[in-house]
Amino acid sequence: MQENSCEYLKHCGSCTLDMPYSEQIDFKKNFIKEHFKDFHNGEIIFFRSPISKFRSRAEFGLYHDDNSLSYTMRRADGGYLKIDKCSIVDEKISVIMPVLLDLLKENQNLKAKLFGVEFITTRDEILIILLYHKDASTIIQELTWLQSKLKVGLIARSKGKKLVFGSSSLNEKLFINGKSYHYVFGDAAFIQPNRNINENMISWVLDHTTDCKDLLELYCGHGNFTIPLSFKFNKVLATEISKASINSALKNCELNGVDNIKFTRLSAEELMEAFLFKRDFRRLQDIDLRSYEFSHILVDPPRAGCDKSVLDFIRNYENIIYISCNPLTLKENLKLLCKTHSVDKFAIFDQFVHTNHIECAVVLKKY
């Protein structure tokens, strides 16, 4: 296996693990085994990632030097490092990075007060977001020209404004267990940044979801897990606080021929109030909570994990699927969850190769 040969490795603050990939795997496995030995002594599956060209979303700073312009990353020791390529980004990003930079250098108005660039890719598409310290509406003509040259979706953001040239949404296709799933989402959506690992995560969850009746999902986003799981359950109730994500999720149901999911824009705390019949919500007026027979609950919380009230709520369910982007908060949450449940399955997903980041998933079953 070819190791990370990036010329910026020892200086860039993004890839912090300067070691062969086999050693990175051992490091992460040992970390998890040590920290979770009180909760699980069974098998822990490790899902490897490609070690290059795996990241589908990336953001770079920009360094201005007279008439020159360079991409930057934060240095490991502070400050900024000028770069002209990045080995971990999707191939489509690698190809368009120098093209975009050359076009920006041609036009003083386009590059003035431009401080960052974000790239988002799917399997077949790419979207570019330019970040300005000025009112981008003053350079609409130049941005229109730039989009015509790039022939991809282009967004300019500045001081609360968002200008769109072409499309601001992306179409994705995932292949999981011999079946394809279609998604659409906007530029502000939370997406899994490693497509290969995302497919493995969904596949693993599907493989370890059995004896299914109805599913309750918290933090569902645009339906990344919801859509594939809907084919295993009678009915699904999924919650999310972002209106844009809910709209994308509804569209994704149409794209995949799914009609057994109800999406509702509620926070986890509001959902608990609804289930305890402490409060009525207009957003639930067409949903009969008593009609569901939930056999599983899936949570994919932010890095802070679930607070005690949410943990007390999800402990009511026979089967818990917990996706975690922070093993330390997962460990804290398991201290309470394992009073009523045991960890049945445990997996590590290497979303961010060459970093300390560890993504985990556990399946818990009630005693």
From Swiss-Prot:
**Where, in this chain's numbering, is S-adenosyl-L-methionine bound?**
Q192, Y219, N224, E240, D300
Instruction: Quote the InterPro entries the UniProt record gives.
Output: MeTrfase_TrmA_AS, SAM-dependent_MTases_sf, TrmA_MeTrfase, U5_MeTrfase_fam
User: What are the EC numbers?
Assistant: 2.1.1.-, 2.1.1.35
Q: Which GO terms describe its biological process?
A: methylation; tRNA processing
Which keywords appear in this protein's UniProt record, sorted alphabetically?
Methyltransferase, S-adenosyl-L-methionine, Transferase, tRNA processing
CDD domains, per database record: AdoMet_MTases (cd02440)
Q: Fetch the PROSITE patterns from UniProt.
A: SAM_MT_RNA_M5U (PS51687), TRMA_1 (PS01230)
Where is the catalytic site? Answer: C325 (nucleophile), E359 (proton acceptor)
In which domain of life is the source organism classified?
Bacteria
- Transmembrane spans: none
- What GO molecular functions are on record for this protein? rRNA binding; tRNA (uracil(54)-C5)-methyltransferase activity, S-adenosyl methionine-dependent; tRNA binding
Q: Which SUPFAM superfamilies match?
A: S-adenosyl-L-methionine-dependent methyltransferases (SSF53335)
Q: Hey, which family's this protein in?
A: Belongs to the class I-like SAM-binding methyltransferase superfamily. RNA M5U methyltransferase family. TrmA subfamily.
Q: What NCBIfam families does UniProt report for this protein, alphabetically?
A: trmA_only
Question: So what does this one do?
Answer: Dual-specificity methyltransferase that catalyzes the formation of 5-methyluridine at position 54 (m5U54) in all tRNAs, and that of position 341 (m5U341) in tmRNA (transfer-mRNA).
Question: Which protein, by its recorded name, is this?
Answer: tRNA/tmRNA (uracil-C(5))-methyltransferase
